[in-house]
């Protein structure tokens, strides 16, 4: 049911996506069941680590199969869409940092019900000491996706190049990696206790 919900939500049915999501939830569900059954012959650390592998596969599948990128030139008050989000370029401001000057874009992100979700503020920075230009990405994250915005070159007359990235399930890559690490710590602690009992 959860797998079907994910496909309906992202509106994509690629073979790689199907295999990845089914495999991920098979690993996750099996290890959750085993963990609650508390089988004495199985290490809790190993079960937790395997659970992390399932979460990792979930994140990698989502971020590689359903990612979307949009590159567009926008002027202030222009709007664009990516997936279910409407993005409005509200304003551009000059700001001064401790060792840089920057142009900061202010973008409002709305959902399909016209509720504001977040404000993204990507920057285009100039460091006079090193004579370097850099871009500062603005990110909004939740459990279903990451939304990135990058402000490129431009001016008030022609507008600015804006890069928008929609990356689903990215946070589950990090949660999966941390869960694998936690499983390793649990196994290490369990092995140390066994050694102490034997000594």
Regions found by a protein language model. Name each.
Residues 1-82, 87, 172-199:
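Contiguous transmembrane helix-bundle modules in multi-pass membrane proteins
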Residues 61, 92-95, 167:
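Short beta-turn/strand-loop junction motif enriched in small, turn-promoting residues
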Residues 161-175:
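Juxtamembrane/start-of-transmembrane alpha-helix segments at the extracytoplasmic/lumenal side
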Residues 39, 46, 66, 93, ...:
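Residue-level detector of functional hotspots within protein domains
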Residues 70-160:
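Soluble non-transmembrane domains of integral membrane proteins
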């Amino acid at each position: 049911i959860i797998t079907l919900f994910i496909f309906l939500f992202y509106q994509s049915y690629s073979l790689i996506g199907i295999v990845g999501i089914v495999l991920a939830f098979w690993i996750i569900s099996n290890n959750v069941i085993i963990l609650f059954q508390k089988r004495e012959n199985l290490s809790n650390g190993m079960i937790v680590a395997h659970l992390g592998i399932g979460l990792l596969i979930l994140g990698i599948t989502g971020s590689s199969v359903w990612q979307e990128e949009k590159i567009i030139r926008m002027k202030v008050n222009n709007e664009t869409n990516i997936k279910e989000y409407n993005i409005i370029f509200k304003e551009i401001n000059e700001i001064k940092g401790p060792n840089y000057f920057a142009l900061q874009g202010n973008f409002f992100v709305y959902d399909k019900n016209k509720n504001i979700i977040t404000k993204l503020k990507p920057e285009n920075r100039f460091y006079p000491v090193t004579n370097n230009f850099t871009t500062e990405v603005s990110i909004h994250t939740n459990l279903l996706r990451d939304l990135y915005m990058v402000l490129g070159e431009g001016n008030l007359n022609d507008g600015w190049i804006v890069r928008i990235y929609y990356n689903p399930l990215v946070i589950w890559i990090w949660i999966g990696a941390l869960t694998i690490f936690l499983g390793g710590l649990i196994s290490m602690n369990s092995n140390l206790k066994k050694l102490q009992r034997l000594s």
